[in-house]
Amino acid sequence: HAPIYKQAARRAGEDGTYSFDYCYEHIAPLYAEQDVNWINQETLCSDTLAPSTYPSFSTPGDCARALYRAGVRVFSLSNNHTYDKGASGIAATLQFWESMPEDVVTTGLWRGEEDYDRIPLQTVNGVTIAYLSYTEHTNGIRQNKNMTANVIYTSQTDVIERQVRLARQQADFVVVGVHWGVEDSHAIVDSQRTLAQNLADWGADVIVGTHPHVLQDAQWLTAADGRRSFVAFSLGNFLSTQSRPDQLVGAILTLQLQ
């Protein structure tokens, strides 16, 4: 949102950069205690696109670099704003993430169907974690032939099932981010519950929901093979200027995988 960009620019001075570290300074100590930090990066990040706000977002790369300094290493890129800037936005954000340090893991953008069998993996303390992410929609903006990468929609259940089952084979734990549900609603809709159970049955251990901008419930699910899987249907907002009381309350989910 524009007020955040503008304050970051003021804090950086007049050199044309942005200082977002102030946004995360009180959270960084918590992140430092964790082995893994995952976030839904809901806007395109780049060093080339001009910053822009609602309804078509673009965020300075300095924001992602500040998150990196705060301890975030896993970025989910699949959400309703992924296609906001069309083909040029996809190209710019891919270029940006490729320039980030090697220990950064991104998930949710795929370079065509031939890329679908590539499962993003991270090994931490000898434990391998797979990360996948999907979105319910992209605000009516569809992929075009000039886009060099694409999201996978929650309606593409055959693709999702294949990816989750592949991830189950390759990793000790499978974490899935899903951008779903109704904005500004605490109610969990049937499609969320159905997909969550399917993801658990296919092999997901943790399911993290985003998009509603407010908190929704969390619960344990029993998978088809008897495993217990945890789903948080919506963590609410993390950093925004939305001002409704329930939009101001977000959650940071901490889990111990064992």
Regions from the language model: what does each represent?
Residues H1-Q258:
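Acidic, metal/ion-coordinating pockets
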